[in-house]
Amino acid sequence: MTDVALVALRCRTSDRTAGPVRGVDALAPLVGKRLGREPRAIGSPGEPHVARWDEDLRDSRGCLLEAGGQVEDALTAGRLPVLLAGECSIALTTLPTVLRHRPDTVVLWLDAHGDFNTPGTTETGNLSGMALAGACGAWDAGLIAETVPEDRVVLAGVGDGGKLQVVG
């Protein structure tokens, strides 16, 4: 079996309900048992609330950078990073980090939404609805210099017909 670095990201990034962190807390011990690894818990849950993308980006900056750092550390050590997170904003730092280490990687984005909004196109202001666009460099989150080339991304399960995501 591949050596796995299992990380449970418990910090709030753009959660609008308590469900995402509860999901991480429920899955982490189960995945850890299955992999024979104790998950490393990062952060503590914040109070879920509705905030604009720029507020969430500012408030979750440390968690997002830590998520990218966990991927960096795992790949540098020759380990497979497995991150459990409650929502998509972590893609802002994790996906570009993976592509820096493994440029031949193809991202399979399995989501009901494309998450390809930008600050200029979002109708809801939800940071998670902008995650893939930010990772691909369609807008600058100010977190990481590298971006994911759009031709390295495959969308699957997008239920909105490929239109920009509307989260609400």
Regions found by a protein language model. Name each.
Residues 2-168:
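Conserved alpha-helical scaffold segments that buttress catalytic/binding sites
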